[in-house]
Amino acid sequence: HDGIVANPNCCTIPLTCVLKPLHEEAGLARVRLATYQSVSGAGARAMERLRGEAPADHDLRMDWDFDGDEFDEEAKLRAETRKIMELPELPIQATCVRVPVLVGHAEAVWLETEEPLAPERARELLASAPSVRVEDFPSPGKAAGIDEVLVGRIRRDPTIENGLALFLASDNLRKGAALNAIQITELLLSRERAAA
């Protein structure tokens, strides 16, 4: 609808923050990822249930709609990433799971670039990317309560040509929702002022 802006999925936002500078440098050819999503993404009831159980006993409900092949969360991640990155044909395969963590989503990402991209160069690009912080070992616990997407474990993926592997974590209630909505509003207001 004209005049309505949709806030992307809480896993799409951190993923695209990390993919964008890598794509601008070397072009993306393919992306595969697994998400490890905290129970806060399923709501307050899920958080209360986790608080009352030992994590080992927690029933990891996959609370997304399933079409027989994939969860709608996986399809949404693919569609939104393609749209945001302006790469409508980009091959993306995602597997999404819910984990017994209160706040913070994590993603293991394997990507293939069109041009060679050394892990050291990827680290440099990500270290200077907006809303991204390079950490040796990102985790949902480290990401909880902060605005940046934490990314680390950046290394060559020897199973494919021009392959990189990395791990990221973000606060799904901040960067994945509220903060991102504020940043979108600020961007729209700055564009409006510039046009006036």
Question: Residue spans of the language-model regions?
Answer:
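A glycine-rich, Thr/Ser-enriched phosphate-binding loop motif common to dinucleotide/cofactor-binding enzymes
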Residues: 3-14, 69-75, 173-180
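Predominant activation on well-ordered alpha-helical scaffold segments within soluble catalytic domains
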Residues: 16-23, 78-82, 123, 152, ...
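NAD(P)-dependent Rossmann-like dehydrogenase/reductase catalytic/cofactor-binding core
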Residues: 148-150, 155-196
